[in-house]
Amino acid sequence: SRTATHSMTTINPAVGASGNDGKSGIFWGGGDLNIEDATLWIGNRIDGQRDDYSIILRFVNVTIPQGATINCATITLRGEETDSTSGLAATIWGVDADNPSFPADYDAAEALTHTTATASWSNPAVTAGSNINTPSISTIVKEIVDRAGWASGQAMILVIENNGSSAGVYRSFHSYDSNASYAPVLNVD
């Protein structure tokens, strides 16, 4: 039997609206989802006050055919502050759903269904105003577009989650609300 494969052209959708990126985390012991802040944080920002901040990114109109071959995929983020503390560890995963909406609140963010595929990111130092790419997330994107219900033009959510960073170790990136031209970008080839 023959399996059809779909060739990919390079696409680069950016987060295109205020409600499509945000940070989720614990603040003073309670959950918080902030979608209108200018800064996206990954890590443990303030000792004893904020833990496990993660970034949630929703890319709309992702024009990848169902079942397409994914050669390379990354996310480009723009540094908002210069952060060079060592030890930031993050895990990147996707939302295992067809055309997902951005979560309405912290509880909905915590309930998102993870892809089986993940990518580890030992995040290097970030310089304000400079772009940084994640490691390859090809297997994550491939798992999403291989879903039976996936269709070209749907939305895709990717999450960059703090994975045990020490207190005071974090990275700051621009959100759509900070400057739309600096919004996170999904790169797929």
PLM region descriptions:
Residues 50-51, 69, 83-85, 149-153, ...:
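Extracellular/periplasmic catalytic domains that process cell-envelope and extracellular macromolecules
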Residues 1-6:
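Extracellular fibronectin type III
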Residues 7-63, 96-102, 107, 111-122, ...:
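Flexible, small-residue-rich N-terminal segments that precede or flank a structured functional core
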Residues 63-72, 86:
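Low-complexity, serine/threonine/proline/glycine-rich extracellular segments that form mucin-like
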Residues 143-180, 189:
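Ser/Thr/Pro-rich, low-complexity mucin-like regions
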Residues 79-152:
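Beta-strand-rich interaction/scaffold domains
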Residues 59, 69-81, 186:
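A short beta-strand element within beta-rich, extracytoplasmic domains
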